[in-house]
Curated annotation (Swiss-Prot):
Name the UniProt record assigns to this protein: Protein RecA
UniProt cross-references to SUPFAM superfamilies, sorted A to Z: P-loop containing nucleoside triphosphate hydrolases, RecA protein, C-terminal domain
Gene: recA
One BP term from GO: DNA repair
Main location class: cytoplasm
Organism: Bordetella petrii (strain ATCC BAA-461 / DSM 12804 / CCUG 43448)
Gene Ontology CC: cytosol
Length: 357
């Protein structure tokens, strides 16, 4: 008897739940609530490469996650904008639409083109106020047709009241409130439309800090909480060719990561006018993973010598990009992360459609 009554109660509960789910879907639309075990739910995180193999590995999932808020911060001239332009180039390669909200009014389009950004398809906005920048971002996210938005930078998102006020006016907390309100509004839409939003941020010093780290980022604490990934990028040295400085040695630390264990770091070279030296990373990480063999100054792959000295091998891989991708994907496989060709599920279907057409 007890068994029958418990079954009946369970059946009633199941019916009540089904009715509630149906009502929610009717009111808020299909997909507003679902069982995690259902096929419609995506278990795998869609990612986009950062343009750096080492950083993709450090992130643990093979790149930056889509449908999330990302914060990239660091001192001046550390490579923040370069890194975001590389991400834009990678997103465009796989068919994504990208927007650059240039609040600093300092985007160098020639440099962006050198990094592989397709300027013809890039959406660029240079807003007058912080409110305007965030309203434009909100409109682009809600459209559902933009895959990546970069905001450069949080420090330049000046509230309208500050612009219209006098130079010496004290308006404490205004920018922090603006960011907090915008992120509350944006987060749910970002997830639903699978759009990645990257905020570039600057570093400030906290006055009077005796112990601990005196560094902080601008725009209050909201961005720290809403970000799924926070990257701290620093210049750690210079790359010289003779006496001439031709690039920077850069270190990126994954300070926060909601999609994989945090606190990993990656080091790579940023060459002036060329961006992240991907080939250099492929060589170093290929040797570490045992994919590329190094004997003295000679480097070999699959029993074939590919060059003597790192610079020669780098040039060889630039001339043979298909070999570079092959080695990179073997390194990714070795690390258990998604290969470059598979970072965007829609691209395969699009490729098939192109083939049929």
């Amino acid at each position: 008897m007890n068994d029958k009554s418990s079954k009946a109660a369970a059946s009633e509960k199941a019916k009540a739940l089904a009715a509630a789910l149906s009502q929610i879907e009717k009111q808020f639309g299909k997909g507003s609530i679902m069982r995690y075990g259902d096929n419609e739910v995506e278990h795998d995180i869609q990612v986009v490469s950062t343009g750096s193999l080492g950083l993709d590995i450090a992130l643990g999932v093979g790149g930056l996650p889509r449908g999330r808020v990302i914060e990239i911060y660091g001192p001046e001239s550390s490579g923040k904008t370069t890194l975001t332009l590389q991400v834009i180039a990678e997103m465009q390669k796989i068919g994504g639409t990208c927007a650059f909200v240039d609040a600093e009014h300092a985007l160098d389009v020639q440099y962006a083109a050198k990094l592989g950004v397709n300027l013809t398809d890039l959406l660029i906005s240079q807003p007058d106020t912080g409110e305007q920048a965030l309203e434009i971002t909100d409109a682009l996210v809600r459209s559902g047709s933009v895959d990546l938005i970069v905001i450069d930078s949080v420090a330049a998102l000046v509230p309208k009241a500050e612009i219209e006020g006098e130079m010496g006016d004290s308006l404490p907390g205004l920018q922090a409130r603006l960011m907090s309100q915008a992120l509350r509004k944006l987060t749910a839409t970002i997830k639903r439309t699978n759009c990645m939003v990257i905020f570039i941020n600057q570093i400030r010093m906290k006055i009077g800090v005796m112990f601990g780290n005196p560094e902080t980022t601008t725009g209050g604490n909201a961005l720290k909480f809403y970000s799924s990934v926070r990257l701290d990028i620093r210049r750690i040295g210079s790359i010289k060719k003779g006496e001439e400085v031709v690039g920077n040695e850069t270190r990126v630390k994954v300070v926060k990561n909601k999609v994989s264990p945090p606190f990993k770091q990656a080091e790579f070279d940023i060459m002036y006018g060329a961006g992240i030296s991907r080939e250099g990373e492929i060589i170093d990480l290929g040797v570490q993973a045992g994919v590329v063999d190094k004997s003295g100054a000679w480097y070999s792959y699959s029993g074939t010598r590919i060059g003597q000295g790192k610079d020669n091998v780098r040039e060889y891989l630039k001339e043979h990009p298909e070999l570079a991708v092959e080695i990179e994907n073997k390194v990714r496989e070795n690390q258990g992360i998604v290969s470059r060709a598979a970072t965007f599920p829609a691209s395969e279907a699009e490729a098939e459609d192109d083939g049929q057409a």
